[in-house]
């Protein structure tokens, strides 16, 4: 699968984003020192490990991984695809005391919550962000930034 990775930078807001659609294949344990990561299962099913937690994610499920949290996933069905959005932890710096990190509650989604309004909204703005990032229009960066801000609204 060809992977297009879109990088967006908004230095005035300390917001740096990357987004792409990924084919979930192998188990590669890793972490991001200064980034949060959303993973949204677009199709298929995957097993996900975040720190000491292991869980199965199905279509429309969402997980958020905080900075420095080790994580990995692998597909349990053929053609599993995920939308991955990574964004800088620095974006929250003005709202935190020294040494604190921003914490989002309620992740991962699951069978009972994945279709709820919160997760539907996250999927909508994530899709809008990817769509805007992939456009060549001069207004696309504005649309992407607006979608990112709405996506990150806790």
Which residues are covered by each model-predicted region?
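Conserved metal-binding segment of the jelly-roll/cupin
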Residues: 57-70
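A hydrophobic/aromatic-rich effector-binding and dimerization subdomain
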Residues: 2-17, 70-135, 153-154
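All-alpha amphipathic helical-bundle segments outside canonical DNA-binding/catalytic cores
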Residues: 133-150
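Conserved GNAT-family N-acetyltransferase fold
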Residues: 39, 63, 83
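Amphipathic, well-ordered alpha-helical segments in soluble domains
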Residues: 37-40, 121-128, 147
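Generic protein-terminus/edge-of-domain signal
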Residues: 1-58, 101-103
